[in-house]
């Protein structure tokens, strides 16, 4: 085996389905098992991202007759750690009947308000906006994932052609469309027209796959992702996709020293209106990105996948720093002006894109701070959320690097990004979050 092929093999995601363990499981338990396997690997989907579903025949508590019930991951929660109570359950027939009343894309918010009327057995778990995407795909088992390798192809400027090159006719392609009922209708139509397809790539978004059994669905999901991983590894061998390295990384102790000096200073500048906690990441992927000649250009384009920028804001703040010439004091002194500039640009973005009825502008401070030669700092309401934001931006880095290696990376149009960030449904989700704990945002 050549060294390159051996490297490719190490990159692939292992099929961890245990037939013996799965043999005694109910359909619902198999769905949960599949969800845990998929959610355990961040190459498959990020924390809290993606969703899974199964269509299960069950006794109707109202009539005693048998009905088909859509079990689908509900709003919030994480695939890798959720329990059965994390699934929303809906009468499939009622959900499908909503097609007759759908009036077009302007009707999306109203449709979401109708999903609770389809609830089976008084389940309190709120359905997510992806619910109809699962329901209208006429397959028993469906996965929706955000794998870095697949999103790299989805975010490439020639995404449709690359999809054909990677998967042939096994995986289809649909142009960007905001998640909702319109996209669900298009997915359903695609499946009807391509009965032999294993899945479909959604431009600038992610992947849908399906199967006739839970195990087959899991296997198809891994096969589609692994095909992308292997194809990108072959195409990008020896090609970092980020250009030459412009800034060499500092030694690890010095990186930590710089981060330790910056973090309390940044925290003091951004902890109004709410206190925040920071996280530092100097992993290899981050150091390669912040040191590359294309970092400034790519960071300015912004992230593409909605799951990414909802956690990280559309763009990071890249701090100007030349470790060979600049002192730490000089870098620290630049922070107030750099953060003020970012806040002004974010406010201008809000004013350019706001619509009548848009929610009020949110906190304009950066979430992600990139420092050449040093790494990345993220700030959020608590340590866990700051760490997760860093994980999401590493996902975005992986996408940009791989897309640039085979094509050119393309972010979402600014208005599309704004319409998701300030979507009334996202605002409602934020309002459902529990209030901060008394010591949230504080450090000891």
Predicted regions and their residues:
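Glycine-rich flexible loops
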Residues: 1-444
């Amino acid at each position: 085996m050549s060294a390159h092929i051996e490297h490719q093999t190490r990159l692939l995601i292992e099929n961890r389905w245990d037939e013996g363990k799965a043999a005694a499981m109910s359909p619902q338990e198999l769905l949960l098992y599949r969800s845990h396997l998929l959610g355990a690997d961040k190459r498959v989907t990020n924390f809290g991202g993606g969703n899974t579903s199964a269509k299960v025949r069950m006794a109707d508590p109202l009539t005693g007759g048998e009905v088909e019930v859509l079990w689908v991951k509900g709003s919030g929660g994480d695939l890798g750690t959720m329990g059965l109570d994390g699934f929303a359950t809906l009468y499939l027939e009622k959900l499908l009947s909503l097609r007759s009343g759908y009036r077009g894309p302007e009707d999306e918010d109203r449709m979401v308000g109708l999903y609770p009327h389809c609830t089976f057995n008084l389940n309190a778990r709120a359905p997510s906006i992806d619910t109809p995407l699962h329901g209208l795909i006429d397959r028993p088992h469906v996965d929706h994932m955000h794998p870095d390798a697949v999103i790299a192809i989805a975010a490439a400027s020639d995404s449709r052609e690359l999809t054909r090159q990677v998967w042939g006719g096994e995986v289809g392609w649909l142009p960007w469309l905001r998640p909702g009922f319109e996209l669900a209708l298009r997915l359903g139509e695609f499946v009807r027209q391509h009965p032999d397809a294993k899945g479909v790539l959604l431009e600038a978004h992610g992947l849908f796959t399906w199967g006739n059994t839970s195990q087959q669905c899991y296997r198809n999901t891994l096969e589609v992702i692994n095909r992308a991983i292997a194809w990108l590894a072959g195409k990008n061998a020896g090609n970092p996709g980020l250009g030459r390295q412009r800034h060499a990384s500092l030694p690890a102790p010095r990186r930590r020293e710089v981060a330790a000096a910056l973090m309390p200073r940044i925290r003091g500048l951004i902890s109004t209106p709410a206190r925040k906690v920071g996280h530092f990441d100097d992993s290899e992927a981050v150091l390669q990105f912040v040191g590359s000649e294309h970092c400034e250009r790519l960071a300015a384009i912004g992230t593409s996948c909605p799951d990414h920028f909802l956690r990280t804001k559309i763009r990071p703040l890249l701090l100007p720093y030349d470790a060979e010439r600049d002192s730490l004091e000089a870098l620290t002194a630049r922070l107030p002006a750099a953060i003020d500039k970012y806040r002004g640009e974010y406010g201008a973005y809000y004013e350019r894109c706001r619509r009548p009825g848009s929610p009020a502008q949110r906190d304009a401070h950066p979430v992600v701070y990139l420092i050449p030669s040093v790494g990345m700092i993220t700030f959020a309401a608590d340590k866990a959320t700051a760490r997760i934001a860093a994980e999401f931006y590493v996902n975005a880095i992986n996408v940009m690097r791989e897309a640039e290696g085979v094509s050119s990376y393309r972010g979402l149009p600014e208005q599309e990004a704004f319409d998701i960030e300030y979507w009334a449904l996202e605002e409602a989700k934020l309002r459902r979050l529990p209030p901060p704990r008394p010591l949230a945002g504080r450090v000891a």
